[in-house]
Amino acid sequence: MQSFFCVYGFFGRLKERKIMTVKECYSQMNGDYNNVLSRFYDEAMIKRLLGRFIDDTSFRALEQAMAEGDVQAAFNAAHTLRGVCQSLSFTQLCGTLDPITEALRGGNIAAAAADMDKAKREYDVTLSAIRACMEN
């Protein structure tokens, strides 16, 4: 079910903006809505957790550690972020973090770096979907 609400835009013209539901958010980011709903039972709780994900610094820490060549810090950040993504059923993003985390676990920063662009794209898609959902 799609919902719409009206807002006044520039010069007071009435325009419609789509309200994104939590389920639509998960669809947009290729996450597993049914799984997260079975875990937390309540869309309001899920939405609060989505809001907290926006402020999570794990991806930035991963990027910084990778840039500095710090394998241990990169592994810690990737492992933390992957755990959060698993808990929130961010299936697509989690899938891009798996090879990075495992490469870093083995100390192979070059292999992890090869997958960072894909992870960054999925991270951006996930954040974009969450931000659209949080506008409600």
Model-assigned labels for residue ranges:
Residues 2-76, 80-136:
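Two-component system phosphorelay core
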